[in-house]
């Protein structure tokens, strides 16, 4: 989410460009901040789906879980980019303060019993057991 915009800044280090894209980063960060909810493991977007795979629940393919690593990874990345942009541009405010509090509270990446990153909030059986994620 906005990563391609921020990567252009990282490549060029053009502060004028960063100033131009900052409102986009900020509004996306605000949206994601408002979507986060408390779970027993931390903050997450609830519910969520994996964009490419489903898991089995009582033999049925299910696309929706409590939360997904894909969603949380995107938000973690966005929040880090936004906070870095705030520092570069010397823009601190209520939202950056909220994001600073929320970022470390987002559910950490979970590993399964076989060492793989869990796609969902639990170690479910995947519909596509040979799916390409590691």
Model-found features: residue ranges?
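Active-site core of glycosidic bond-cleaving carbohydrate-active enzymes
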Residues: 1-11, 15, 19, 23, ...
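Acidic/histidine-rich catalytic neighborhood
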Residues: 27-85
